A protein has these predicted regions:
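Acidic/histidine-rich, metal-coordinating catalytic segments
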Residues: 177-194, 212-216, 269-272
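Mobile genetic element proteins and their domesticated derivatives, centered on retroelements
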Residues: 12-13, 23, 44, 59, ...
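RNase H-like polynucleotidyl transferase catalytic core
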Residues: 91-97, 183-188, 202-221, 237-241
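An active-site-proximal beta-strand-loop segment
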Residues: 116-151, 157-162
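C-terminal domain-tail junction helix/linker
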Residues: 195, 202-206, 228-294
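Active-site beta-loop-alpha junctions of metal-dependent nucleic acid enzymes
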Residues: 135, 154-177, 193
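Double-stranded DNA-binding cores of transcription factors and transposases
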Residues: 1-12, 16-17
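Basic, flexible linker segments flanking DNA-binding modules
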Residues: 13, 20-119, 215, 270-284
Length: 294
């Protein structure tokens, strides 16, 4: 509101039914809100560089943690801010493939009877393909089922079992040599049934569990981690130039995933935080029709 000939701010406020002090307070609040929204916008852009498909609900919680619950808009207003700034997300398509036609021994599913209450009690492993300009490569993952932390990974140009063993050895390196009491769960892929892989587990006291009915829910945590990497890193990006670029980008994403990305299924903790805890974790996961594609 500007002063014009014959109509100053005081008179204009009186005509509109509020005081000049109220006008200046409102203008100050508007300015502060715009400054905060610009800060939130820059923070969201920074986080999306690490995780291009990070959803609106998680971003809202992360902004409240960064700027304070009393300053950040409510959830619905935050979603509107994302919409105004063109920061809402499209829905991604899931993709999956598996093959277990081989001569090696296949173990029964004992993981379905286990509800871990600490880390390094149940590991789940899987392999997913990553497209690059030269064709594709393969991401071998070992994930802790309690904390959802990725404890071992390897990106390779082939499906040879030695690369799955490399990811497993990385997981063993952080857990220690004695795996007594740990259950390792996977699909029936030849890599996990191979003599080399089985030896590394059984020689350290681990028990082996495998899916039985070709049902993705039999290895749900591993499938979910695959989906997060695909939907939040791979699908939104241009195709990786080569395996070296893919390895670098995936490595950075896994660091972000473990250390910064909260999960509803573990009480909105990060996997690294949950990995240090003991006891049941709160599962906040449910369908949120009010979140849309955020």
């Amino acid at each position: 509101m500007r002063e014009r000939r014959g109509l100053n701010i005081t008179r204009a406020c009186a005509l509109l039914g509020f005081t000049k002090q109220a006008y200046y307070k409102s203008r100050k609040r508007t300015g502060e809100r715009l400054v905060l929204e610009r800060q939130i916008y820059r923070s969201v852009l920074s986080l999306r560089k690490e995780d291009p498909m990070l959803g609106g609900y998680k971003l809202w919680l992360m902004m409240k943690d960064a700027f304070g619950s009393g300053k950040v808009p409510g959830r619905d207003n935050f979603y509107r801010l994302l919409f105004r700034c063109n920061l809402t997300l499209p829905r991604a398509r899931p993709r999956h493939t598996t093959n277990s036609n081989h001569r090696f021994h296949k173990y029964r599913n004992i993981a379905k009877m286990i509800q871990p209450i600490t880390s390094n009690a149940l590991w789940v492993s899987d392999i997913t393909y990553i497209e690059i300009e030269e064709g594709c490569c393969y991401l071998h993952l070992v994930t802790d089922a309690y904390s959802h932390k990725i404890v071992g990974w390897c990106l390779s140009e082939s499906l040879q079992a030695r690369y799955s063993v490399e990811a497993l050895m990385q997981a063993i390196g952080q857990a220690g040599e004695d795996l007594s009491g740990l259950v390792h769960h996977s699909d029936r892929g030849i890599q996990y049934c191979s003599n080399a892989y089985v030896f590394e587990l059984e020689s350290r006291g681990a028990l082996i569990s495998m899916t039985e009915d070709h049902n993705p829910t039999d290895n749900a945590v591993a499938e979910r981690v695959n989906g997060i990497i695909k939907q939040e890193l791979v699908y939104p990006s241009r195709r990786f130039r080569d395996i070296q670029e893919a390895r670098e980008r995936i490595g950075r994403f896994i660091q972000f995933y473990n250390g910064q990305r909260p999960h509803r299924s573990i009480g909105m903790l990060t996997p690294s935080q949950a990995h240090r805890l003991h006891g049941p974790l709160q599962n906040l996961w449910k369908k949120r029709s009010d979140e849309g594609a955020c």
